[in-house]
């Protein structure tokens, strides 16, 4: 197995799904967390001048979905054929689009105080409209897979983890009832976060502001 080193801020943000994939697979990695001051030094060392970044035996890979997809294949948490892999990529693109949408894309910066706004009001006025646009799409994919709490097949894939982490932040940082209208997404979150390996990690994970 390669030596993995993962670079991201000391928050969940866009990096937590990557950490969860390592814990799901029970694979060791160096979890390099840092603040803004240290980031000023590290930035020039990153391929695109941004994080998350995964270093694999000295080779750095950037972009959340590229890293998650690689780990999905590395840990046998991807599709078993080309069509299934393409379907997972399709769903991942929807999740990534949601995370980069006008409201959700700014919400972490609001939580961290980088954008001055009332958190509750911003969530209601800017994030919930994004949820109403994208959550029904993911809900449909989950229902089409047989209502087993997964997006494809009967075993957690990298996209299940990516989606569960992305949507769970709506409840953890936004509103407890943010996903009440989407029972299949709630079932996905419940299934992923109750996997023994992930459950153990989350039980020991420190709270972060975003």
From Swiss-Prot:
GO MF annotation terms: glutathione peroxidase activity; glutathione transferase activity
GO biological process: glutathione metabolic process
Reactions that this protein is recorded to catalyse: RX + glutathione = an S-substituted glutathione + a halide anion + H(+)
GST N-terminal domain location: 2-79
Residues annotated for glutathione binding in this entry: 8, 39, 43, 49-51, 63-64
Keyword Transferase in annotation: yes
Enzyme Commission number: 2.5.1.18
Domain GST C-terminal: 81-210
Keyword Cell inner membrane: no
Record keywords, A-Z: Transferase
TM ranges: none
PANTHER family (alphabetical): GLUTATHIONE S-TRANSFERASE, GLUTATHIONE S-TRANSFERASE GST-36-RELATED
Biological function: Conjugation of reduced glutathione to a wide number of exogenous and endogenous hydrophobic electrophiles.
Family membership: Belongs to the GST superfamily. Sigma family.
Name of the protein in its database record: Probable glutathione S-transferase gst-36
Organism: Caenorhabditis elegans
Native organism taxonomy: Eukaryota, Metazoa, Ecdysozoa, Nematoda, Chromadorea
Gene symbol of the encoding locus: gst-36
